[in-house]
Amino acid sequence: MEYKRFGNKIIVRIDKDEEILEQVKELALKENIRLATVQALGATNSFTVGVYNVVEKQYYANTFSGSFEIVSLTGTINTMSGEFYTHLHMSAGNDKGEVFGGHLNRAVVSATCEMVVDVLDGTVDRQYDPVTGLNLFKF
């Protein structure tokens, strides 16, 4: 991964064989990012995304491998109990035009991933919500 910071905006290149969530965490810790939005696109050959069942309060994961274009990767970097936390969703399409997506659990870059991180002044922590079973923004 390489990146360049321009004020509160960080332009990131995640390289072949690097795992996206690991690189986002490394960047956030290195740059002391407590709150930010994330947008990206690129290519992956292995990824896992989940879909949350609200009734069961459980994620169901789907893993894909092959040639995929990341058509959208979006979400937030923030904190939970004062520690790094990220919530990203990703959609990726294959050579048949099929697109798969959900809550990002893991994605390995096959060529490149181009990311823009918009750092916000402030902190928004998360806390577990027993009603939804999710870690929600705490204001």
Language-model-detected regions and their locations in the chain:
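N-terminal intrinsically disordered, cationic/polar leader segments
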Residues: M1-T86, S91-F139
